[in-house]
Amino acid sequence: MISPTMEQGESLRIRVVMGKDRISELPDGLLLKILSSLPTNIVVATSVLSKQWRSLWKLVPNLEFDSDDYESEHYTFSEIVCKSFLSHKAPVLESFRLKFVNFNPVDIGLWVGIAFSRHLRELVLDFYPAELGKGVTFTFPSSLCTCNTLETLKLVLCILVDIPSPVLMKSLRTLHLEFVRYKDESSVRNLLSGCPGLEELRLYRGDDSDIKVFTIEVPSLQRLTIHDNNDGPEFWGYVINAPFLKYLLIEELRCPEFCLNAPELVEANIAEVTSITIEKFLGSFTSVSRLLLNLSPLKITYPTGSMFYQLVSLEMYTREAEWWNLLTLMLENSPKLQVLKLTDRSQNFHKDGLVSGKWNEPKDVPECLLSQLETFVWRRFDWGREEEKEIATYILKNGRRLKKATFSTNPIESEELNKLKERRKVLNGLDGVVRASNSCQLVFKFDPSYLGSDSP
């Protein structure tokens, strides 16, 4: 029985014999770029095509191995990886990606060591044991944090970060930690403090109780992503000190505390924050110029006296109960706001009771409506709700600088005549509003994403 790689190569060779081999006429540099985008088992398979291809694959600067792709009666996965490294001749290894089900720590340490000796720039380790959830982990030790050329490190799933003492990866710019575990809080601090040039950090955490406080203190950090659904009682929250942070994305956060020092923050996208009640949470973002909020005002306390003096673009989701109360507060405290976008991400236009309460317009017209707001977009506008019609009317009546207002709604089947008539009546009503801005262009359209994607 021949290996899958040999079978793939034979198939390629047959196709080349039957037709003209035009690919081989391309320059070697271009061929290497093409091969670099393919998994290593496919790249190795091209070696049967000709003498040119036999030597060409050995110079591909990327090695990618997935143990699921290598099932052979002749060689183990470990032997295949070792043979590939022995044959590989590229002087600089741009990327080494390893996805494995079972492992021998000695083998992995050897492969990573060889990759480091070839000036490795990206390392991806993805361990998904056959018995996921049984506590089996691969320990990522401090001895692997020694590569001076490494620019990107990605650790995925059942990997235990165990770094008892400080390390140094002076060239590391990007670090992804996706559902890994941590020996203790010291391991987190030692890893992050050993990356003096780190610019991007992505954290994905599940329901674990490895640490009580996740501390991120990285002066060079510019981009931070957090997705954390850990709501265990042992986990307190985050302490982040990133004086040069420019971009923050929080996809999910269930911990009770969040302390952020990021005075240079420019853009923040905040969603699915469910347990934080501290008033200063929103106050951490007063320096931003662009802000996206998908929050429930019933779960987040607005910071008294906080002003968003730099905010020029605000996007809010409209599916949470009494979301308009948060909108009112943001309008009142964002005097330079120029762009306002409202989106119903749920695609459920009548929200089935998720939205409740009644909107009350501000006592005084917010400064941004009087002098700054130029663009107003409402995606998946729920024309059937009185509160949303009132909010839309209020903004049109008071937006003195408004240049364009766009409302998109869900498609309605042609046989639903009553709905078609009602929607036309509502949209005609908006069109008839006496707008504060004579130059405001009003646009109505259907939202095509309603039919397929749930993305905003």
From Swiss-Prot:
Pfam annotation, one family: LRR_At5g56370
Keyword terms, alphabetized: Leucine-rich repeat, Repeat
Keyword Transferase applies: no
Residue stretches of each LRR repeat: 74-100, 102-127, 152-179, 180-205, 225-252, 270-295, 318-344
UniProt cross-references to CDD domains, sorted A to Z: F-box_AtFBL13-like
Domain spans labelled FBD: 358-409
Signal sequence residues: none
Domain F-box, first and last residues per copy: 20-73
Identification of the protein by name: F-box/FBD/LRR-repeat protein At3g52680
Gene source species: Arabidopsis thaliana
